[in-house]
UniProtKB/Swiss-Prot annotation:
It comes from Klebsiella pneumoniae. This is Protein MrkE. The lineage of its organism: Bacteria, Pseudomonadati, Pseudomonadota, Gammaproteobacteria, Enterobacterales. May be involved in the regulation of fimbrial expression. Keywords: DNA-binding, Fimbrium biogenesis, Phosphoprotein, Transcription, Transcription regulation, Two-component regulatory system. InterPro entries: CheY-like_superfamily, LytTR_DNA-bd_dom, Sig_transdc_resp-reg_receiver, WalR-like.
Amino acid sequence: MPGNKIGLLNVHHRVKLLYGEGLHIRNLTPGTEIAFYVPNNSTPQGDGVAVVMSGEKMKVIIVEDEFLAQQELSWLINTHSQMEIVGSFDDGLDVLKFLQHNKVDAIFLDINIPSLDGVLLAQNISQFAHKPFIVFITAWKEHAVEAFELEAFDYILKPYQESRIINMLQKLTTAWEQQNNAASGLASAAPRENDTINLIKDERIIVTSIHDIYYAEAHEKMTFVYTRRESFVMPMNITEFVPDALNIAASGQSKFLLTVAQVSIANRF
């Protein structure tokens, strides 16, 4: 596979290390694709790292203004994962500019960086339609609560042990794979291009993902709508609001909202 830096012998030895079986590799030409079939009852041995031979890699960026720290993290990612580092930055605004035109799956983020600190940067990123995983790696422990509120994947304090990073990389890879599998399942149901609904607050129209709506409550000729972060008062009764939500839910991508609309809508008398 072009650009793949994993040598065939290295792959062979790592599989042998994991499963205790030798595999014969011979007469391979450049570009040959190989697949390893491991019996279902095989159990990996030791602490080896399984090699996943797939065409898609997890795309990540590093945001760190200390050069040596940036290089160390880059080495750990390249050594202990199959992730592809598509950019390294030392300035928060540069990251926002990059993300306007590029999609990434995860961001390794320091907090004390120029122009826009890591917490503010994460708050901006949390508003994106595509929300990458965010892993804070910082010397500032006092921002852990904010990181939790932003639903960060992890919060790692400097100085860290290599094992801490390796463990995080493995968990992050698993979470990304599960996310992709879930997305593939939803795609087969032919989802709508935009799963959003317009809500009103302070005379402004707020375009909101229906996945953020978890509760709607009827009150006379108004409907109170609650999302994960805030609440809205819609100038319509609930029988007008619910069909809009159900029409979107009918696409197949919004089973959660369909359940909410059918079961969790309260009428106040």
